């Protein structure tokens, strides 16, 4: 019988495969959330390097946020990663939500990144 962690890993791998297949070589906006913080990075899988990154642990955001684990933090991280990606010359990405549902903090980050100038 599969454990919860195995199922989460299978879901993440299935989504990553679809992104590679349909992404057309575009960089991906990858999101990771923990119980206390949220992280986002724009990754160029062809070159194997990170183009832009932001998290709720960044000094600029840490001072503004009450906690790194709520939707307000996700919105701030989404705007910051979009700003940094646009500055790096990236505006078209694919959204990699990992094994997380498109709901709550993940949705808030995605919508803020769209408002910040990223298209996906």
UniProtKB/Swiss-Prot annotation:
Transmembrane segments: none annotated. This is one of the proteins that bind and probably mediate the attachment of the 5S RNA into the large ribosomal subunit, where it forms part of the central protuberance. GO terms for cellular component: cytosolic large ribosomal subunit. CDD domains: Ribosomal_L18_L5e (cd00432). InterPro entries: Ribosomal_uL18_bac-type, Ribosomal_uL18_bac/euk. It comes from the Bacteria. This is Large ribosomal subunit protein uL18. Keywords: Ribonucleoprotein, Ribosomal protein, RNA-binding, rRNA-binding. One of its GO terms (molecular function) is structural constituent of ribosome. The keyword rRNA-binding applies. NCBIfam families: L18_bact (TIGR00060). Part of the 50S ribosomal subunit; part of the 5S rRNA/L5/L18/L25 subcomplex. Contacts the 5S and 23S rRNAs. Signal peptide: none annotated. Belongs to the universal ribosomal protein uL18 family. One of its GO terms (biological process) is translation. The keyword Oxidoreductase does not apply. It holds the Pfam family Ribosomal_L18p.
């Amino acid at each position: 019988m599969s454990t919860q962690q195995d199922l989460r890993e299978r879901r993440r791998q299935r989504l990553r495969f679809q992104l590679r297949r349909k992404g057309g070589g575009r960089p991906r906006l990858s999101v990771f959330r923990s119980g206390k913080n949220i992280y986002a990075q724009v990754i160029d899988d062809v070159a194997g390097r990170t183009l832009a990154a932001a998290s709720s642990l960044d000094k600029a955001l840490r001072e503004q946020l009450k906690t790194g684990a709520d939707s307000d933090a996700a919105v701030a991280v989404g705007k910051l990663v979009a700003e940094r990606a646009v500055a790096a010359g990236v505006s078209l990405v694919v959204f990699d939500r990992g094994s997380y549902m498109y709901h709550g903090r993940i949705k808030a980050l995605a919508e803020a990144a769209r408002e910040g100038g990223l298209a996906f």
